[in-house]
């Protein structure tokens, strides 16, 4: 019997694609190569700064209902914020809040602290390295109280405007930068809308920062198109809330540290209430002194007897 021949291994040919190669994109300057486009886009994309600002908003225990409503108004205006439960600890409040900020993945904090059910203090903090600012909040008017006609879409990004005197001193420049970072909503945030329809106004009057929120309104019909940049027809309608910030101290760290600035014109609410009590006590003392003076005057100047006083008594 003859030997069987060894069959050589059959090599399978690679399948030929019937479809034509994908056509490159055409531009005004010619055909666009995908490889060059990818290479050119990598360093440009890597150099783009992405704002990942997140703000933790919380308050202390035993806060007044008006101040709690103000905090909820701020939460509704800032879609990039995270609301947390009330903080109880007093002695270690700074350490507790710093830990909360780290757990929530936030970089800033707005802490509303209420004392004696009357006074509201607001901490504006950059964590973990600072700085931090402590304000006394006055002239609080919430959206529910004002009932203004302005209305803007929830989650839309605001335009931030500052008065010119923010550039006068160094501490005002620092406060302007902190307000810009905290109240400025990051572009492309998942809870924000990609356009502007309201304005946050920060103005300095009598060394106080006054906050206002206005809607940008453009009256038009459905058939009419809005001219781009037509500022003559645009009007501002106030939405709310309103409040006034009186800066007390600026610290170098988060919820403490070295004092960078202290307001020399600040007067605490306790001193104001004590002065009012003294004035009231002075009014009461003046009344008592007036009564004693009147009695002494009556004793020193008695009435002369009248000859007709007992005329009808004999009958």
Swiss-Prot record:
Record gene name: BRIX1-1
Record keywords, A-Z: Nucleus, Ribosome biogenesis, rRNA processing
GO cellular component: nucleolus
PROSITE patterns assigned to the protein according to its UniProt record, in alphabetical order: BRIX
Annotated knockout phenotype: Delayed growth rate.
Official protein name in the record: Ribosome biogenesis protein BRX1 homolog 1
Chain segments carrying region Disordered: 1-35
Biased composition (Basic and acidic residues): 19-35
Pfam families: Brix (PF04427)
Species whose genome carries this gene: Arabidopsis thaliana
Gene Ontology terms for molecular function: rRNA binding
Triggers of expression: Induced by glucose.
